[in-house]
Swiss-Prot record:
UniProt keyword Membrane, yes or no: no
Transmembrane segments: none
Stated name of the protein: Large ribosomal subunit protein uL29
Similarity-based family: Belongs to the universal ribosomal protein uL29 family.
Gene Ontology annotations for the cellular component aspect, listed alphabetically: cytosolic large ribosomal subunit
SUPFAM superfamilies: Ribosomal protein L29 (L29p) (SSF46561)
UniProt entry keywords in alphabetical sequence: Ribonucleoprotein, Ribosomal protein
InterPro entries to which the protein is assigned, alphabetical: Ribosomal_protein_uL29 (IPR050063), Ribosomal_uL29 (IPR001854), Ribosomal_uL29_sf (IPR036049)
PANTHER family (alphabetical): 60S RIBOSOMAL PROTEIN L35/50S RIBOSOMAL PROTEIN L29 (PTHR10916), LARGE RIBOSOMAL SUBUNIT PROTEIN UL29C (PTHR10916:SF0)
Ribosomal protein listed as a keyword: yes
GO molecular function: structural constituent of ribosome
Amino acid sequence: MSKTTTKDLRNLSDSEMSDKIQNLRKELFDLRFKQATRQLAKTHRFKEARTELAQLLTVSNERSRSNTSS
């Protein structure tokens, strides 16, 4: 998976962003489950998913704050 930049994330529509957030949360849940059952091979995916989720939530919060202040 290529690294997603915040510039790319800012170009997403609100619906695309919410879909990505939902998918990443599901992926993190699945990763935690696989790790608990010792089936996880790519442990680095935890950090990547958490980072991308944080970036998406940051951009989402920026949008909501700019909409309320305007």
